[in-house]
Amino acid sequence: MTDKTFDSIAYFTKLCEENKTCRDNKFVATTCSGPDTVQGVLQKFRKASNFIMVSDTVDSNTHSAGEGFFERYGYTVWILAAYKRDDMEDREKKLNLCRYIFRQFISRMLRDKYREAFEGQLEFLKLTQIYSSELGRWSMNGVTGLYFMM
C-alpha cells in the first residue's frame, strides 16, 4: 500500500516558489495553526509583507461509504498581502492580487491532479468544490486577502 497523504505544506510552498506572480510580489510561504496562531507570519514579518500561509493542522471527517470507513481531510490555505494603512485603493489592489493568485493556484492544482504530479498526492483531493472567503475590511490590521479550504 502506498502512502498518498497530501503534504499541503510542501505542495503550497512549491507553488509559492514556482508561481511568477508570487515571486514578482515577494510572497513568502509559511505555516500557521489557524487564524489565531500566525507564528510563521510573526517570524517573518520584518522581511516580508505578503504571505502564503498553510495551516499545519487539518480538519477531518470519518464517514462510512458502503462497508468501510473513510477519512476525509480539509486543508486551509491563506493568501495575505499587506496594504498601506487607511488606503482603501491599495487594499483593493492587494485583494485583487490575492484573488488572482488564488485562481492561479486552483488552475495549477487541477492540472497537477490530472497529470498525477506531486507523486499522485492530489489524487484523492476533491477539487470540484473549493470553499473560499475573503477577509473583511477590519479583519487583520493592514492585511487583506482570503483563505480557501479543500
Model regions and ranges:
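Small/polar-rich, solvent-exposed N-terminal microdomains that initiate assembly or binding
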Residues: 1-67, 118-121
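Generic alpha-helical propensity signal that fires on short helical segments
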Residues: 45, 69-71, 95-97
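Acidic-leaning, charged glycine-interspersed low-complexity segments
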Residues: 6, 19-24, 50, 95-149
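Glycine-rich loops and low-complexity Gly/Arg-rich segments
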Residues: 54, 77-81, 100-105
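Short histidine-centered catalytic/ligand-binding loop motif
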Residues: 86-98
